[in-house]
């Protein structure tokens, strides 16, 4: 089924694991076929004096009248990412309403320099809303591959439907990015959401697949400096499937922790040793600088990814930064998860989110959310027993959280947000989440201990990883083995969880109409194979006004 806003032209076409492993997953237990007009071959390597576009093109953060365009030019052979080499280079950009570029609607130029790693960003305005646009760059007589970007509907437009690809957690060494290839081939996406862990910071062989690496990182060591982060971003953007998806539709991206270091918090990270690995402030600044250089992201506030986009009267999308302002994570079973002085969002961001959700006049309020907000607890007791016992023993008030890196570790922020939704009768809030390397469909209860007899304030769709290890990979058993055992146990202890798949890799497609928001979950045949196939797994939806998830059998 094609998007209701897709033009006919566009339609063509658990054991002890290393401390450097993701907290969630351990606690809970390229040959490619490119699509249609986006099948441009990778350009040849730059030769001296001949600019080349080796890292593809991208667009992001669509507005009704504009979109942010991105590329990197390689002006000379020695001007590799992170090298600091290469001359200033004039780069032109052209935007048209047809892929033959006969109807040009915008053009201009800028200068790419070594100071920005020869990356180029052009924030184009004055475009028509809800319209496919084609764009390309040029330098020294060389044209880049063409990309397609769709502008958002006008703010007051009555929109019949929207469709977004949804992905997270793509570890280069763990496999190939076939999920991106399959999303690119659809040709019906208004945009795609990357919910974090676009890159990983580990050194070669530290975080692969079942103890091996399918392909090697660059640089080979753990990334610490600005040059390191630039090299790693550059390696990722040589992937043909990632290039194809970036050329197919605008990305709306937020970071999680691995864009910087595992389990990042405001003053450090689990995967950072102060002094030995330099100063945290310098490392964080380097990682963020490289991210904004290499990603088509338009920050509303410098140094953070929280911002808001609108898609007509149908939906708005609040995008969160859950790393820059958070308190340090506490250990499993620590009652400090309930400490009101500890924050995940930071005061300013939480107030911004609450105000935006309250003032929204759209049918759906989407929240791009890097870590799971629905409670995920073990050892559940009845509410009348849990609260006094937790108070007596200094345990978490909402049960023993499996992962204190997510909202479970910052329950005061969550309680405040959910109470705000309930007290203001804010309906149709849908959290879109990554991070945990599993697929989930959740209600978001106000009180998990009394659910489902008590209210649900929102719903949540969690997508699995593109390639990063999930439970079956960590315990090295056949895919599906762990999920068959773990899923019933998880659901029994967490009655707001409608479904969880702990084992498979893939992606989601979110389809929205005025009546419902539906996530279709797709899984890959084998992440270690560049030509991996994709198949539909399940679909869940939330109907308008219900604040609850239900299964459906009709993928869009």
From Swiss-Prot:
GO molecular function, one term: phospholipase D activity
Written domain comment of the UniProt record: The N-terminal region contains the catalytic domain and the C-terminal region contains regulatory elements.
Source taxonomy: Bacteria, Bacillati, Actinomycetota, Actinomycetes, Kitasatosporales
Variant or mutagenesis effect after changing residue 259 to A: Little effect on metal content, visible absorption spectrum and on activity
Consequence recorded when altering residue 217 to A: Strong decrease in activity
Taxonomic source organism: Streptomyces chromofuscus
Protein's name in the database: Phospholipase D
Signal sequence coordinates: 1-46
Location, primary (coarse class): secreted
Highest taxon, organism lineage: Bacteria
């Amino acid at each position: 089924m094609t998007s209701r806003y897709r033009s006919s032209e566009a339609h063509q076409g658990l054991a002890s694991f290393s401390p450097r492993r993701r907290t969630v997953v351990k606690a809970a237990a390229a040959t490619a076929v490119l699509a249609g007009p986006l099948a441009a071959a990778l350009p040849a390597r730059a030769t001296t004096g001949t600019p080349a576009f080796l890292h593809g093109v991208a667009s992001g953060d669509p507005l009704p009248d504009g979109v942010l365009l991105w590329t990197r030019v390689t002006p000379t052979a020695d001007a590799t990412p992170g090298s600091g080499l290469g001359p200033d280079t004039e780069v032109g950009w052209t935007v048209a309403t047809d892929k033959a570029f006969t109807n040009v609607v915008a053009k201009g130029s800028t200068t790419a320099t070594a100071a920005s790693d020869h990356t180029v960003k052009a924030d184009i305005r004055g475009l028509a809303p809800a319209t496919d646009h084609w764009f390309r760059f040029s330098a020294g007589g060389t044209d880049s591959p063409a990309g397609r970007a769709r502008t958002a509907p006008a703010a007051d437009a009555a929109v019949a439907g929207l469709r977004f690809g949804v992905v997270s957690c793509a570890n280069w060494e763990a496999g190939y990015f076939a999920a991106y290839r399959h999303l690119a081939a659809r040709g019906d996406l208004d945009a795609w959401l990357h919910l974090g862990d676009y890159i990983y910071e580990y050194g070669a062989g530290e975080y692969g697949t079942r103890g091996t690496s399918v392909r090697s990182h660059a640089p080979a060591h753990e990334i610490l400096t600005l040059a390191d982060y630039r090299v790693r971003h550059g390696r990722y953007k040589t992937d043909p499937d990632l290039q194809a998806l970036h050329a197919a539709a605008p990305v709306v991206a937020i970071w999680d922790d691995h864009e910087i270091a595992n389990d990042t918090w405001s003053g450090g990270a689990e995967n950072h040793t102060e002094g030995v690995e330099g100063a945290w402030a310098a490392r964080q600044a380097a990682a963020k600088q490289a991210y904004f250089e290499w990603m088509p992201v338009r920050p509303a506030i410098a140094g953070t990814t929280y911002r808001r986009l609108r898609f007509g009267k149908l939906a708005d999308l609040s995008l969160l930064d859950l790393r820059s302002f958070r308190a340090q994570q506490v250990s499993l079973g620590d009652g400090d998860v309930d400490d009101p002085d500890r924050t995940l969002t930071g005061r300013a961001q939480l107030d911004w989110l609450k105000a935006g959700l309250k003032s929204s006049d759209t049918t759906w309020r989407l929240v791009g959310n890097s870590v799971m907000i629905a409670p995920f607890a073990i050892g559940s007791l009845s509410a009348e027993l849990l609260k006094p016992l937790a108070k007596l023993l200094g345990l978490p008030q909402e049960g023993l959280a499996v992962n204190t890196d997510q909202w479970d570790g910052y329950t005061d922020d969550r309680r405040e947000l959910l109470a705000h939704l309930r007290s203001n009768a804010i309906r149709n809030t849908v959290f879109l989440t990554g991070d945990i390397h599993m697929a989930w469909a959740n209600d978001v209860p106000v009180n998990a201990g009394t659910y489902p007899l008590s209210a649900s304030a929102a719903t949540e769709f969690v997508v699995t990883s593109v390639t990063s290890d999930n439970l079956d990979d960590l315990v090295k058993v056949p895919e599906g083995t762990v999920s068959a055992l773990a899923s019933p146990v998880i659901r029994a202890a967490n009655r707001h969880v409608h479904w969880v798949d702990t084992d498979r890799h893939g992606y989601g497609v979110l389809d929205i109409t005025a009546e419902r928001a539906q996530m279709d979950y797709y899984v890959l045949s084998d992440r270690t194979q560049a030509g991996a196939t994709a198949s539909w797994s399940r679909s869940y939806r939330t109907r308008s006004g219900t604040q609850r998830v239900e299964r459906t059998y009709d993928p869009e």
